[in-house]
């Protein structure tokens, strides 16, 4: 378990609190500012931005549900571009930007008419395109650069293309809402219980702020949210949520940890600054990307489309 004196140094490297001779005052200050220091954000602004994004998504799903595809496509493009910038600035990686951007959009848009065949076909063509695009720069750094391009391609557009698949059935709006609500419940439960009761670090070398107590909150809130959504939105057996909830929460938390690991490796705090109070859009997409394919699969299995 990390001590209270070490946390301020890790979360805010330039802060003098950790080096203060008055350890009692330093601990009190750290405890008093816990909500903002743990989030590292302007909380009111972050909440306002989050509510605005939620309103746009909700209106689109309740009016013309196909507009969800455009939201996914734009979000994937922004997230992909943020990853490009972070990898290039921090590590000098030369990515296959054009093939990944074009191929990523193809996967998302072709998932609507062609399903998994459209996703797989676009993925294969994009992989070959990445090889050819990077080949023109020579052998130096080829494996590193192509590997990073594959990471971006699979992490963002490939995973998010399954978010498109969620909206395809007639009850697609309810499926997308179920997916989003479970992930939001997971984030909310993890933040709330982690802030209140967090004592045991979950992955101290990856994300020191995450605790097992917070993970328990994510499981609890996510499972309750999943059960309610399955019963009320999808009109099916509520106990399916006992399966869907924990699995989606596990994927969402994994995505969050993966992004934390990438940022630590690159030595950066945020992927970008697109969203006021949040950082980059990838700070919001990380858990959604890794849970979208699993959400689609679980709902197809347990709540088959009509």
Predicted stretch roles:
Residues 265-288:
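Interfacial loop-to-transmembrane junctions
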Residues 297-306:
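Juxtamembrane boundary at the C-terminal end of a transmembrane helix
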Residues 289, 294-298:
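Hydrophobic alpha-helical transmembrane segments of membrane transport and translocation systems
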Residues 2-246, 250:
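Membrane-embedded alpha-helical bundles of polytopic integral membrane proteins
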């Amino acid at each position: 378990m990390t001590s209270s004196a070490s946390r301020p140094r890790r979360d805010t490297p330039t802060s003098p609190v950790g080096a203060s001779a008055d350890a009692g005052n330093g601990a009190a200050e750290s405890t008093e500012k816990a909500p903002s220091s743990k989030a590292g954000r302007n909380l009111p602004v972050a909440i306002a931005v989050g509510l605005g994004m939620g309103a746009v998504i909700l209106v689109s799903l309740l009016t013309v549900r196909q507009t969800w595809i455009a939201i996914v496509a734009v979000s994937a493009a922004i997230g992909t571009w943020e990853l490009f910038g972070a990898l290039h600035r921090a590590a000098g990686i030369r990515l296959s930007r054009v093939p990944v951007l074009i191929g990523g959009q193809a996967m998302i848009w072709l998932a609507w008419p062609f399903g998994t065949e459209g996703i797989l076909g676009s993925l294969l063509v994009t992989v070959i395109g990445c090889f050819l695009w990077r080949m023109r720069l020579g052998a130096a750094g080829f494996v590193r650069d192509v590997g990073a391009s594959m990471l971006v391609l699979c992490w963002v557009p490939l995973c998010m293309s399954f978010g498109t698949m969620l909206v395809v059935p007639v009850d697609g709006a309810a499926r997308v809402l179920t997916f989003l609500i479970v992930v939001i419940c997971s984030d909310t439960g993890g933040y709330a219980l982690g802030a209140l009761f967090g004592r045991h670090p979950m992955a101290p070398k990856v994300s020191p702020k995450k605790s097992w107590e917070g993970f328990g909150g994510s499981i609890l809130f996510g499972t309750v949210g999943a059960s309610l959504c399955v019963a009320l939105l999808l009109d099916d057996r509520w106990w399916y949520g006992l399966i869907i909830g924990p699995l989606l929460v596990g994927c969402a938390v994994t995505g969050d940890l993966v992004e934390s690991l990438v940022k630590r490796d690159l030595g950066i705090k945020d992927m970008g600054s697109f969203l006021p109070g949040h950082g980059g859009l990838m700070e919001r997409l990380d858990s959604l990307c890794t849970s979208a394919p699993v959400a689609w699969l679980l709902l197809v299995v347990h709540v088959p489309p009509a």
